[in-house]
């Protein structure tokens, strides 16, 4: 991902992302495109305020439901935050990546509760494991770098539990081994415990392949193709020349 920080015409820092079809420029704070929705920072805050007002006016009535056009606005806005938190991750601005991933997780929870149609709930919530993994990485990475391993492991455990809860919510816990985001956090936890104790993991070679495959899935989803190629080569080396079943 080709991303850098530049000074904008207003003197404030901006994120500049170079894409195949051009350059994307994002604000550091507020909505990434710099726009506002009336008196609110974002469509999410706008609909949250409307929901509170509705609840106060109709305390015993049904909640105000999000219609399809509302969800579309929230989805497009959520994609902006996705581009920004990936940019912050690549810039190693972990605290800002954690801020934006937490924001999108709140978005998913809001849509899950108030969207009228199940198809729109799933359209958002399908990304919960990925964003949870990214949030966990953003929180735990600087802690591990500071060698605060208990705090890092606690953050990883919280991420693992959140993804497991997602699988429980959809009656898919029996497929936990197929969830790349969950497996990556589990293996990262093992590696972090090994760093803390100085004791290598048992069965390192087998688990390394599983961990690398999970990383490969993430690299492809983030369009980090050079990293993906490197990971494929490493998997082939460890597996004795057998290529993984990805593209």
What is each of the regions a protein language model found here?
Residues 1-111, 157:
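N-terminal alpha-helical interaction modules that lie
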Residues 3-9, 14-27, 34-35, 39, ...:
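N-terminal cationic and glycine-rich segments that engage phosphates or anionic surfaces
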Residues 63-78, 120-132, 196-208:
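TPR-adjacent "capping" and linker segments in tetratricopeptide-repeat scaffold/adaptor proteins
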Residues 66, 113-129, 168-181, 247:
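Acidic, Ser/Thr-rich low-complexity linear motifs
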Residues 74, 81-82, 100, 129, ...:
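TPR repeat positional signature
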Residues 84-88, 92, 133, 138-143, ...:
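Conserved small-residue packing positions in alpha-helical repeats and bundles
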Residues 97, 104, 111, 118, ...:
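Alpha-helical solenoid scaffolds that mediate protein-protein interactions
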